[in-house]
């Protein structure tokens, strides 16, 4: 009998049996090519194997095929044979310029530390078989093309159209608050389509340059996105830090409002990027150039203030002029910096800088300090950095030590001003002669005794010794009332007075009744309290003062005094003391009579009910 022919079902079962006993087919993988890299840079080409039999650690061998001999393989390096390299690659393998690095058992990477033009060609990754059957592929090739280094980076000279960089890095001195502007020229002539990224960085003064010491300030990424280093992110967001591209190859960084921490050596780093066949962008070249050594001079180290013309001795009513000079290597006031200047005065022997007399703010607007609003005082800028304070008529109270205070401001983002420095001058003594006015006052209660409801008249006689012609007197009346339950009196309250200009001023009378104050003689004043009441009881005194008027029509107090105490006690009239018992007796009699009448009426009504 003949052998039966296989049926389709049996053939299918046989095929499944064969596939079930053998499911391995070795695959070697390398990146898709061609890969474009730049001479002088490093490259890493990965290789891994899958679907293999045998040990987990596989061996790898790398070969190269040069364009001029595409059929000739040149052994580069192997994971199992240290003598594998051909003579042309031996020195580079020995120096580490060419090496294979194992990532894991079935994956390695070929590393070339510094590409050369003759490294262009096909690279083959081969894996010796450890399989029971020869299935799949045991090698894979990728093309590497080495491009010449066409990347150029240099410092851009000042001016928007500059092209030639200086032979050595410049040294720039920038004042705090000013703009720091640096330019960088970066271009490539590579024939392939590439992108450039440009980054501005700063290294602290005298620090070696490297990735560890170079702090990125701001950079333009390969996708044209602008990003800042972490310490500068806020300044970029506020617009204080800017980066722009001008033309095809010029990049400009502007740091507004330079700070002390901005000092250092600035570099420009340009990187060239190319897109691999797998769609990823890879950096293929990088170069760095020193732009400038920048020194930011802080305003606090430069600001200085001097005053003149020296110690002053003047008489009352004379003008007082003081000059203040602000010096130092300072930026002019304007878009980046502003200044304010003021004068302070402290009485002789008083601690601290004193109180403000007058000042010019950052806008040049003048203002007077507390207590000087009614004075004829001028504060003005008489030269570029010279300021003058003028008091039209000095007073003895103006004597003391004067200091000039200057403040420097820098403008941050927008129009916001930030105080950066301040300086005070040395003290300048000013002496103003006293007028020599001596006042004495004697006050008394006319009549000696006053009763409730009457008018109390208090008189005050003033005597004057010394003083200039035209001296005028003023007098005011004050009362200290005894506080309830206290032995001592409360604070003095103004009752009334007459000023040096003859105008009466009325205060608050304790009893609330009418008050009159008047000048009854050249140096005699009178206070009258009408309708005296018990609330007017207290201790009164007269307080005269001497006033001098200067040519600028301002008044100043040249002297003062205080009289002795005058006790005002409103007595009660004798008839009033008799009238009180009468009222009390009448009241008691009425109450007693009413009580008796009520008792009799009550008893009578009870008897009527019983009947």
Curated annotation (Swiss-Prot):
It comes from the Eukaryota. Member of the immunoglobulin superfamily (IgSF) that links tetraspanin-enriched microdomains to the actin cytoskeleton and plays several important roles in innate and adaptive immunity. Acts as an inducible receptor of HSPA8 on dendritic cells to enhance the CCL21/SLC-dependent migration of activated mature dendritic cells while attenuating their antigen-specific stimulatory capacities. In complex with alpha-actinins ACTN1 and ACTN4, regulates actin dynamics in the immune synapse and subsequent T-cell activation. Inhibits the entry of several viruses such as hepatitis C Virus (HCV) or HIV-1. Induction: Induced by neurite outgrowth in neuroblastoma cell lines Neuro-2a. Residues 599-611 are cytoplasmic. One of its GO terms (cellular component) is axon. The modification Phosphoserine is found at residue 516. PANTHER family: IMMUNOGLOBULIN SUPERFAMILY MEMBER 8, V-SET AND TRANSMEMBRANE DOMAIN-CONTAINING PROTEIN. Keywords: Cell membrane, Disulfide bond, Glycoprotein, Immunoglobulin domain, Lipoprotein, Membrane, Palmitate, Phosphoprotein, Repeat, Signal, Transmembrane, Transmembrane helix. Disruption phenotype: Igsf8-deficient female mice show no fertilization defect. Igsf8-deficient eggs retain normal level and localization of CD9, resulting in normal microvilli formation, which indicates that IGSF8 is dispensable in fertility. InterPro entries: Ig-like_dom, Ig-like_dom_sf, Ig-like_fold, Ig_sub, Ig_V-set, IgSF_V-set/TM_domain. The gene is Igsf8. Residues 1-25 form the signal peptide. This is Immunoglobulin superfamily member 8. It is found in: Cell membrane. The lineage of its organism: Eukaryota, Metazoa, Chordata, Craniata, Vertebrata. Glycans are attached at residues 48, 137, 325. The chain crosses the membrane at residues 578-598.
